[in-house]
Amino acid sequence: MTDWNAARYHEISAPQQAWGRRVLERLPLTGTERVLDVGCGSGHLTAAIAERVPAGGVVGVDRSVAMLAQAADWLRTRSPRTHLVLADARALPFRRAFDAVFSGATFHWMDDHAALFRSIITALRPGGRLVAQCGGGPNLATLYGRAGRLMQEPRFARYFEEWTDPTYFADVDSTKRRLAAAGFVDIDVSLEPAPTTFDGPEQYREFIANVCLRHQGTRLPRPEWQTFLRELTVAAARDDPPFTLDYWRLNLAGRRPA
């Protein structure tokens, strides 16, 4: 599987940055904590965390080499004390190392949330908190429904043989159960709509190409990929409002017992 275009993601991920900053406001910090940013991506939110813990420390983890390289470049002068680690969040190389774990738009790219939550609670110190947000429930149902129907058409279907969906949008109840099974207490999980409208067809097309449908794009030759994107963009133009992605955000929080 090809890696992210981290530079483009860094430039166009304003929705993820805005959501992440609001989630960060729900994480109580005094300024001395050691914080783990799970799925740090290109480093925008990692830098925001570092600003809130001037006497603490921040470690960002991601399984994308390209994202970590972009994050290193972004953080070099902004948060030089931040450490970056290449790791899968379902098997973090930490034990009782952090006062808090934060994550933005990451968990929906992983299919084993039970393993994920076990890994995170192991990385937390007793009393440490998890505050996170990811796609959940009916997230992007309109876009992925349209894309799925196109993928089944004869002109595209041969490129998607043995296709495995890379996303997993958990619901509230299953997330509560998995957090509890991992050992978390004070669990709080909720789902909220976050429809996101783009200025026009170019902005919409670029976003879905580089974020939502990145994996589909790796399967298609360039001419077919351009056709695929064009047809989805034409469909989005007929929506009300046009060029809107039907995002849903799953908010989750929990604490490792003291």
Protein language model features and the residues they cover:
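Conserved class I S-adenosyl-L-methionine
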Residues: 1-33, 44-48, 67-70
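Core SAM-dependent methyltransferase catalytic element
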Residues: 206-208, 250-258
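A short SAM/SAH-binding and catalytic strip from SAM-dependent methyltransferases
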Residues: 100-113
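Class I SAM-dependent methyltransferase SAM/SAH-binding core
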Residues: 36-38, 42-91
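C-terminal helical/coil "lid" or tail adjacent to the Rossmann-like core of SAM-dependent
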Residues: 182, 186-241
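Conserved catalytic/acceptor-binding region of the Class I
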Residues: 114, 129-199, 214-215
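A short acidic, Gly/Pro-enriched loop at the edge of an enzyme's catalytic core
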Residues: 90-101
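Helix-to-beta-strand junctions that scaffold the AdoMet/dcAdoMet cofactor pocket
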Residues: 110-111, 124-126
